[in-house]
Amino acid sequence: MRRLILGVAAACAIVALTASGAPAKNGNGVMCVLHARLTTTNETTGSTSTARGHTQIKVRANGTIEFKTHILNQDGETFVAGHIHQAPVGVAGPIVVPLFVSPTPATSARHIRQSGVATPNAGTTGAALCTNPSAFYVNYHTTAFTGGAIRGQLH
């Protein structure tokens, strides 16, 4: 019985020592991989855009954010910017990571594919995105919907 108790205590100690509030990293220096489904129904701007899309975010241990976005742009709207904002569902929030902004050429292609590396604004860390992704959303803007055309919470 004493061995069983010592074994359980040792296992609990190991778990307690290895668990932390910081996001885990994989062997490639990636702290977490997040996704956002971009639609107008998630927008707070009253957007009637017909576009929809998906963004994948990889938060790297060095603080950079890699992103890949694909937007199906059925009506040829002109997309001019994309950001990560901090706010819960249904609330507009401040930009914390610029994904692309002017002078990046605006595009009205039917299939928009964008990828790149971004750096969070001062006061925001990649670890914050990993720890509480639903507190952040991805938002893409068009010339018609400058406040945001499509949006999705990170998860």
Provide a role label for each language-model segment.
Residues R2-G7, C12-G82, Q86-H155:
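Metal-centered catalytic cores of metalloenzymes
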